[in-house]
Amino acid sequence: SELASTDKIAIYTHGGAYVLNSAKAVIESAMFFAAETGLRVIAVDYTLAPHSKWQETTDEVISVFKELAKQGFTADDIVLYGDSAGGGLAAGVTIKMRDLGMEMPAALVLWSPWADISETGDTYVTLRDAEPYYTYEHVLGPSALAYADAKDHKNPYVSPVYGDFKQGFPPTLIQGGTKEIFLSNFIRLYQGLDQAGQTVKLDIYEGMPHVFVPTLPESAESQAAIAKVRDWVSEHLLDD
């Protein structure tokens, strides 16, 4: 149905290491977020790598904001959320929007964000056995090169942990588990935002795997996490 200009919107950038999934494939995650927050969710069906590099992919997400602006929405009406690679994409897109002089979304929610595709971070080594599927040499590395040339892996639009957050960034909730190869990514992104004086919350759950919030919705940890998402959305979007 057509969106009313009074609606509050969640734009969702899905995970899949930039090379897998689609908006249709992740519909259950989008429905979960919508049901738990009461927001209308737009899942971005961005072009996958290698058919699209980061320059085009970030522009595709930004085009959704531009289209909503034509329909009367402002950035204050929108929360941007993403999981895994989609979490890194959401943060990278936000930095790019800021640098382009665009209004940034009211808030971000990042689930297990792949925020540094350059294999920098302690837990790429220390937690590699916790999630053996996500090995850098076999899965993440080839996906990273499909999405961005090696020289661009530390570009803030690609790996937002390298962003200059002193220039501004929306309130950001980062959630993940202790059994994730990307745990160092979460911590470094949080530290960068916190040290720059931005509003940020790091919410980590003992023993939880990658993107547990929507994939283990019946768990006590997921229920606790989504309650904090509701509070975050209420504080930074719905109370405006």
Regions found by a protein language model. Name each.
Residues E2-D240:
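Alpha/beta-hydrolase superfamily serine-hydrolase fold, recognizing
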